[in-house]
Every structure is written in structure tokens, then in C-alpha cells.
Amino acid sequence: MSKAKAVCDRVYVVGGSDLSAPEDAFVYLVDAGSELVLIDCGVGDGMSRIEENIRSLGFEPAGVWNIIATHCHIDHIGGLFAWKERYGSKIIAHELDRAGIEGENNVLTAASMYGVDYKPIYVDTLLKGEAEKHTYGDLEFNFLHTPGHTPGSISVYIDTEDGRVLFGQDIHGPFSPAWGSDLKKWRVSMQKLIALKADVLCEGHAGIYRGEKIGKYIESYLKRYEF
């Protein structure tokens, strides 16, 4: 498997299909000074590998006080229960994806696609607006409601010494009526992300994009899903 690595100032990639478990979306670690923040946590089977990857960077998994769930699909949230049980990590997610995360509607998690069971967990901080700001450690995290892939999909950005870093998980889709996907809302969401003019994009499955390649990447999917 590949090794964990720095993406830019304060940001590392610690999980993914070649880093932790084949089913995992990319998992990103943010060094917020006095605490660590995870952006998603994979399907769950690769948790021990993610822990090892965090330690390889000189951090301790116990420092992960908060986990941001970008949406309710199991390849992003399957490990939430274990992280909360082992380390007491708090979970942040949008209220429109709460039903999937908390176990009210398992179809929303897409767990059946992966052939795995999902252990529900309560969300500690429910995001409700179109945009919110929360401070963790010494960093301000900017949350944007970016529905489309799922009703409660969120994107997050932080400003670092290397510029604006955007966590835009699953920009590429896919879409399904079973999850409440909405292409019209997704297109509006993508325009929001382009307008941010981020310097670094950390995507859920496609990896890292920088500079002008970010807008081109998003535009390529806007063209693919024209209607």
C-alpha cells in the first residue's frame, strides 16, 4: 500500500483505496494545532491502517477530536462508530444526511453496494444552514451546503499558508434517486465551488488538484452531466 503524505500546509492524506482499505474514499487529516480533524473516515475496515498512517506522520489518533462527514455514504462514514467508541471523536454533518448516518434509513448509506454492514452513530454537530463557520484548534473551517450527490452533502474549506484548501468530496457523483440525488442542485453546488477559487482541491476519489486544474476538473463533470 501507499504511504500517508502531506498535501500542503496542515493537510495530509491518511486513507484511501491504496492507503487503508480498497473500499475507502480518501481520508484527509487536518492539523489544527491543539487538535486534529478528519475529513471522512472510510468504510471502517481500514481504521487500523489509518491510525498507523496518522502515527507515521508524527501525530496520535487520539488527537482526532472531530470528524467531518461530508455525506452519508458508507465509504466516507463507515468508521464513525469505531472512532467515536475508541477516541470519543465528535461527528459533524449536515442535518439533511442525518437519517443515513443515524440509521433511520440505511438505503441512504449505499452500504448494500459495498456488501458491508453499517453501524449507526449519532451526529454531535448538525449543520443546518447554507454556510457556517466553526473553529477547531487554531483553524476556522468554512462549511458549505453543496447538495446534489446527496441532499446533505457538504464541502469544507480552510485557508492555510499554502492558500485555500477545499475538501469537495465526490464532486464527480455518481447519482441515484435512492439517495435523493439532484442534478440541478448539484450543478448549482459546483458553481459555488468554482467561485471559491481554491488553490488546492482534495476530492473524495479522484485525489488532489491544484490551481487552474481545479476549475477544469469541475467543469469536465458539468459538461458530462449536461441536461
Regions found by a protein language model. Give the residues of each.
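Conserved beta-strand hairpin/beta-sheet module of binuclear metal-dependent hydrolase folds
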Residues: 2-57, 155-171
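Metallo-beta-lactamase
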Residues: 43-45, 107, 133, 140-225
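Active-site HxH/HxHxD metal-binding segment of metal-dependent hydrolases
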Residues: 45-48, 55-132
